[in-house]
Amino acid sequence: MNAPFVVSPVRHDWSRHEIKALYDLPLLELIARASQIHALYHDPNDLQKASLLSIKTGGCSEDCGYCSQSARRDEVHLDRVEMMSPSDVLAVAAQARDNGADRFCMGAAWRQVRDGAAFDAVLEMVEGVRALGMEACVTLGMLNQSQAQRLKQAGLTAYNHNLDTSPEFYPQIVTTHTYDERLATLEAVRGEGIALCCGGIIGMGETVEDRVALLAILAGFDPHPESVPINALVPVAGTPLGDRQKLDPLEIVRMIATARLVMPDSRIRLSAGRSSLSREAQILCMVAGANSIFSGNVLLTTPNASLDADEALMEALAPR
């Protein structure tokens, strides 16, 4: 065996070397270990369904290489949508709840939160989602401590702010903001006691070492992020990463299993790219430790598995 068996308690001092040893395990051994740890910390039959809505689409000032919403992407065909009204957002949230989602996530395409009418509307949305009996999550870019405090007071459950990749590879993906700025936002959110939703994207041209470095940073947070989205790049024509090849599904499985081992108490969310996976590949991801998915036909601006496909997946997991 190439790595020690992972047991409780939860650790926050994982080295890159230790995580790399886990990542490099033979796949069946890696999945077996991750599945065992998953069962120690979670009900294996518990699969959270979250729903994600773009409440403001396109026109973003940033240049994230994977994203279709940048205002710098003249070659991308995207219908811009200005800020949705709270009533329209809450109608979508209610429908998501009726479709089985218990968390509703709202994303706005901008660099950072700015105080004013738009942010006030977001606060109203958060309050409304909580009143529906759902968890509320937002992804709004960078923010400061006082804005995090207002979100907390509105009842926000979690704030999504992905680190995407390693600090070393990040400048090859984004140039309009820094990794340290991302970390500062996470610190502001943590300072108000809001749960972190923080993960990354694989398939952007990064190395295994970059993936390991990302996991080491996430696993170094105390507490660990409440949820860790593992996204597979969805190449969008016209973006700098639009010509990337489709990721091998087993790379997604390996990333999820390693994340489960080093963050045993977090929800690991099988996120973007899921629509390209077969039903069997998705189930293998769940065996390896994924216990949350996004439900709905679209994730912000990229395709997601259909509701009918997800219904068939749920039936396969737990026949009625």
UniProtKB/Swiss-Prot annotation:
Coiled coil: none annotated. Transmembrane segments: none annotated. It comes from Beijerinckia indica subsp. indica (strain ATCC 9039 / DSM 1715 / NCIMB 8712). This is Biotin synthase. Gene3D superfamilies: Aldolase class I (3.20.20.70). [2Fe-2S] cluster binds at C105, C137, C197, R269. Pathway: Cofactor biosynthesis; biotin biosynthesis; biotin from 7,8-diaminononanoate: step 2/2. Keywords: 2Fe-2S, 4Fe-4S, Biotin biosynthesis, Iron, Iron-sulfur, Metal-binding, S-adenosyl-L-methionine, Transferase. HAMAP family: BioB. It catalyses: (4R,5S)-dethiobiotin + (sulfur carrier)-SH + 2 reduced [2Fe-2S]-[ferredoxin] + 2 S-adenosyl-L-methionine = (sulfur carrier)-H + biotin + 2 5'-deoxyadenosine + 2 L-methionine + 2 oxidized [2Fe-2S]-[ferredoxin].
